[in-house]
Amino acid sequence: MKILMLTWEYPPRVVGGISRVVYDLSRTLLKDGHEVTVVTYKEGDAPEFEDDKGVKVYRVNNYMINPNNFIDWIMQLNFNLVAKASEIIATEGKFDVIHAHDWLVAYAAKTLKNSYNIPIVSTIHATEAGRNSGIHDETQRYINDTEWMLTYESSEVIVNSNYMKNELQRLFGLPYEKINVIPNGVNMNLFNGIERDYNFRRKFAMDNEKIILFMGRLVYEKGIQYLISAMPKILEGYHDAKLVICGKGG
């Protein structure tokens, strides 16, 4: 299967978790025998094209007269993504499916779908309402509406938890059978052969104590506040538990 990945971030550009998800997913799909092409934003000195161990990666510039307007910047990026994808289709043939990652590439995905009759599969990594506990201004409303449009235009929608599945159904009225729960994968080979460093561990807890480790951005949507508020209850059952938080933000 020929798969087109549309994403606004791909290594070396890392804004959040989408970059790593698309990177790992693309390489895994390639190993399963699929042909994967990524079209993304070019940041800094990243090459406009590279063959990343079999994954074809195309990066587009996104010059803007008024770069301070994020929505305009995103719309210009979508225009450039469409132009690059159309160029690839003209030289290498049509893709079998478009995999769009979040609202940031929604209009590019929709345009390519309608222009070339290519189905969309979208992954919704988070929602604007979920990030902000509701919709409070016009920018958030625009993003929320774009998320709805992407899920409407998609043949299938992917989320990584049942919580997100319920959230999409509640926010956008999607039929349950259209939403597929596929948790983000973990490459366990990365942990093979790693020796435990007990001296490092002792910086945070004694040998007989349990460690609860949180790793992630320290922002509301990651839910670290719930873990912190739950600690008194956890300590009732596990008196020797320690919570270690690693991340940036706040």
Predicted regions and their residues:
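Glycosyltransferase donor-sugar binding loop
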Residues: V186, K242-G250
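A short, charged, and often flexible helix/loop element on the N-terminal side
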Residues: V55-S86
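Nucleotide-sugar donor phosphate/pyrophosphate-binding loop at the beta->alpha transition
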Residues: I118-V121, A129-M149, R170, R196
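A short helix/loop element that forms part of the nucleotide-sugar donor recognition site in Leloir-type
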Residues: N192-A205
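Conserved donor-binding/catalytic core segment of Leloir-type glycosyltransferases
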Residues: L4, M206-K222, I228-M231, V244
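Carbohydrate-associated surface elements
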Residues: K42, Y163, G185
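Short His-centered aromatic/hydrophobic patch
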Residues: A100-V105, I124
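N-terminal subdomain of nucleotide-sugar transferases
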Residues: M1-A46, E50-K56
